[in-house]
Amino acid sequence: MAYPQGYLYQPSASLALYSCPAYSTSVISGPRTEELGRSSSGSAFAPYAGSTAFTSASPGYNSHLPYSADAAAAATFTSYVSSPYDHTTGMAGSIGYHPYAAPLGSYPYGDPAYRKNATRDATATLKAWLNEHRKNPYPTKGEKIMLAIITKMTLTQVSTWFANARRRLKKENKMTWTPRNRSEDEEEDENIDLEKNDDDEPNKPTDKGDSTDTEADHKLINPGEIPCDRFKDETHSKDLDPPLTDSELKEAEERTDLLAEQAKPTTSSPSVLQRGSDLITQEKPSEPGHAASTGNSNVTSVIHSPPSAPKPKLWSLAEIATSSDRCKGSSEASQAAGLSQSTVIASAASPTRSSPQCPLPNNTVLSRPIYYTSPFYPGYTNYSTFGHLHSSHGTNTSSTAHFNGLSQTVLNRAEALVRESKVRSQTQVDLCKDSPYELKKGMSNI
């Protein structure tokens, strides 16, 4: 607010009253001094610096109270702003002191009455209680609160003092009580004292008894017992497993294919996918033999794993059902690896659609299933169950008749890429040796 020069701004009486601190009503009610009026900054009721407020009883323009300077009259006017903890009206006015400590509750932090270090009187009280309760020096919550009030200490200080006292007596071999298991209250209280927890760590086994010591001795004497027991449990659980059926064998092979597919990038070119299939077919014959050797080392083999040379009936059935003239040059195992997965997931997705009805066999646009191979998303498995792209669900194996929306040129290009990748995969088997340049080249050709 800007006023013209020479204008005397006089605030109202309510503004002047509320501009003073809440605890300093003694300024109003106490006897006035000349220093207040002559101070360089004036008082809260002065319209300008160095005014003579409250120095005269005349109701002039510079006195904002309608009463005289009488203390009793001013006290009656300002009784509604006075504090119940304030001084009486007869006491001398003191501007700098405000009794903050009293109204803050029973445990006022920062109150000078509560010292940080315990006094002799406080420790004497606590020692007296400890001597009376030497058989059980664990005060309850109520007793701690009572002692805290008497000694003017906080509850934390009392708990810490008793924890330290018990530790001292324990070190001096003056324990006259039986150590007890810590209850919830004791855990709360003794966790405060960090020194006690550190010092008592070596002594804890003696409190718990000899059971932990004997267990530790047994562990030291026979260190190899634990892995042996674990090994026995594993072999026992293997004995209880029933022999697997053909469908379970199929699911086991599907899991190995899933693990191999997760290691690939989701946007790999068909050439990379074909190489991955060839790589997995080379590794796959060694897997059943490895499983058989590990099974025979423990117990008799539960999974009757077929030898690598003769293929079981399962592979040949899937191969005959979905093979075509174009894919006869490829190996049997590569077909079986891809087709067992597609037949399992297709049958899981739609039970009415059997495995011989896969319209796109292993040799078409993509030789391996990409992206998602779980039954939650069966449409991507070998492109075998894309119902919205199929014109019929018969056993026709032509690759281009079932794609209604795709152009013929794109399919021809993709087939040419597959043929290219078959030739290239014979020389390059290792997936890790593919350069990113070849990947980009394969993607750009599509």
From Swiss-Prot:
One of its GO terms (cellular component) is nucleus. InterPro entries: HD (IPR001356), Homeobox_CS (IPR017970), Homeodomain-like_sf (IPR009057), Iroquois_homeo (IPR003893), KN_HD (IPR008422). Transcription factor. Binds to consensus iroquois binding site (IBS) motifs 5'-ACANNTGT-3' or 5'-ACANNNTGT-3' in regulatory elements of target genes. Required, together with irx7, for hyoid joint formation; they act cell autonomously to repress expression of cartilage matrix genes, such as collagen col2a1a, within immature chondrocytes of the joint interzone. May compete with or modify Sox9a activity, thereby reducing Sox9a-mediated activation of col2a1a. Probably acts in the developing hyoid joint downstream of Bmp signaling. In concert with irx6a, plays a role in visual performance. Residues 202-220, 227-258 have a biased composition (Basic and acidic residues). This is Iroquois homeobox protein 5a. Residues 184-201 have a biased composition (Acidic residues). Residues 175-312 are annotated as: Disordered. The gene is irx5a. GO terms for molecular function: DNA-binding transcription factor activity, RNA polymerase II-specific; RNA polymerase II cis-regulatory region sequence-specific DNA binding. Residues 117-173 bind DNA. GO terms for biological process: cell development; embryonic skeletal joint development; neuron differentiation; regulation of chondrocyte differentiation; regulation of transcription by RNA polymerase II; visual perception. Residues 264-274, 293-303 have a biased composition (Polar residues). It comes from the Eukaryota. Keywords: DNA-binding, Homeobox, Nucleus. It is found in: Nucleus. PROSITE patterns: HOMEOBOX_1, HOMEOBOX_2. Gene3D superfamilies: Homeodomain-like. SMART domains: HOX, IRO. Belongs to the TALE/IRO homeobox family.
